Amino acid sequence: IWLMLNIFAWAANQVLGVFSHLTEEGSRITGATYTTVNATIPVTFIMAAITAILGVILGLWIMKSHTLEGSAPIAARASEALKAWKVPTVAIASAIVVSLVLTVAWPVLLQRFRVNPNAQEMESTYIQRNIDATRAAYGLDKVKAEQYKATTEGEEGALADSAESTAQIRLLDPQIISPTFKQLQQSKQYYTFADTVAVDKYDVDGVSQDTVIAARELDLDGLDNRNWVNDHTVYTHGYGVVAAYGNQVTAAGQPKFFEAGIPTQGKLTDSEKYEPRIYFSPNATEYSIVGAPEGTKSWEFDYPTGSEGATNTFKGDGGPKIGNIFSRLLYAIRFGSDQILFSNRVNSNSQILYDRSPKERVAKVAPYLTLDGRVYPAVVDGRVKWIVDGYTTSDAYPYSQMTDLGEATKDSTTESSDTVSSLNSKNANYIRNSVKATVDAYDGSVDLYVWDQSDPVIKAWEKIFPGQYHQLSEISGDLMSHMRYPESLFKVQRELLAKYHVSSANQFFSGEDFWQTPVDPTESQQAQQRDILQPPYYLTLQTGGSSEPVFSLTSSYIPAGSSTREILTGFLSVDSDAGHEKGKIGSSYGTIRLQELPKDSNVPGPGQAQNNFNASADVSKELNLLESGSTNVQRGNLLTLPLGGGLVYVQPVYVKSSGSTSFPLLKKVLVAFGDQVGFADTLDEALDQVFGGDSGASAGDAENVGDTTDDKQDAKNDDSADGKTNTDGKQDTPSNTDGKTGGNNGDSSGTMSADLKKALDDAAQAMKDSDAAMKKGDWSAYGDAQKQLQEALNKAIELEQ
């Protein structure tokens, strides 16, 4: 009986196993094909039936063999046994022969002699199933595609109808300007910023502005006096965020900050309830012990001011209390530190903060979610919040194309950044951005919000963990305004859409209209040979179908294959503005728009646009002059924008001197439209060059046209004028949008001395002389001006200290 049951179970398993063919990876598509449906699956049912019959035969044989008389002569019993074995032997042998014929020979013969010669016709039904399922599983079934007949001839005034989009073109490259943030806003060597700052949007003076933003995190590697007390009880947190306009720079090429300084001042933190302290962040230390007895002096370092600095005591609920000896012993063992057990800094009010990375905290709360590779800060309702996107995934969606999420989300940013990563490598054929998570930078509290309420997977997890999730209605308007379309999901979708924009099974089979994401042309030749893809970019622009400019995530396509002729075939964007209403996602959020260029289009792709820049004699000459001195040229992200009836390429060019304390400054902007190239000190001027002398719209840096001197804000804000990090432990004067000094509680009076003002004026004049000499190619004068600049900056630093 046991043998029969096992045989029946195996047969049943074979029947149930046919469903695995629906997610089987084939050479062309995922899912069952003609041969699978017409040979493999029927054969499976036949073999299951044969196996069941065989089980019955064996069962009957076993029962019959037990009826042999035990008292019969041995010879008689042997003869009977031999006869009895004939039936099962023949049955098993027959089953093996039938199995070989049906499961091996028949599918192979069918595929080779019937399917392969007529593959396009015979596989079309199953390819169509794959197309439809893939689009549904990856959220591509509602893509708004349109033909975009792009011109390559730039005409005067062509951008007049795109004035708002033109004004918002982002100049600051989030991958390049982190060193600039550090030098101008780090304040002290024990603070740092992410190596790739975030792009977000904020309402500034009633106008939505693309913004580059970063949190000032703690970095103990920059602390001179390292010991257990300092590392774990004194230097416990970072302080504030720094934000700059994405589309504007100062005349000197520095970011134009609207939230800066320490203590933080600016447009984002004018609320009295603002909490700037950052105890939880991606770069936070392994653990900190916070809390002090009532009535005692605070010992946590808060921010630099005066000769000693301000102090603070943590007042939140961010970690376990370790006031009793047993808790101290446990954590001393966990972290391998006897100081936790014996230090007087550990008291009855002490808490220990650990697992401080926002992504790590969300993973602890919801380990079943796949988390986005980027965590970004936002100032929400007076607090700094880290926003983490969570995905539900599956590899069991019938007929949907399987994708390696890790490979699909790699690009030049993830390859070069320590703070942005691709998704963990795993196969999936269904993905939804079903969860938005926030982590409070002060107390580490984690809030999970159900974002995609139609996702059945997250509905199941809600039932398993009741009360773990907040509903959409609980998202405040301020938080909603910073919920953006996540990059990792978009990168997965753009990889699939490169093929699955094709809706016809016959066209899909031919593969003639397949696309690919271009490699990043700003990377080294070696990186381009490794097919390091161009990342998507957040931009505010107006695309086909949208009535006004929208904060969007964008990418582009070129033809698939290895052809050296790189033309643009498509422009992809998704509306990333979730609106600002409490509990309500903006109606256009998540709308994916695909602008397909005609097959005979000759609009250059990103790689060709970069080649056009490199081939321009004027551009090459000036860049070579810049690089021949003591400076390095860094080319920023190459942005693609559907403007002026065609595609505009914009690339900021940064210059960085070779000194150890130097930082990138935006000095030039490259623009291309068709084969026309513009190259100027400002984006506004470069656009005019490719559009007949007048583009018809003003860029964000239009006010800098004709102005090569440092502006008033930079002359007043010493931390954005000296370009160096103060490392002596004394207070830097913070900058703010009003150009005033402030935030000093120590020896500074808050006003600028005449000597300091003169030193800064001398620095500004030296920068002006440097620019003038550089344009003339007079490198002797340029060297003299740089020397004068260094002397003026050193004098300014000395006076400030």
Task: Annotate each predicted stretch with a short phrase.
Residues I1-D732, N736-K776, S780-G783, L789-E800:
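Soluble extracytoplasmic regions of secretory-pathway and membrane proteins
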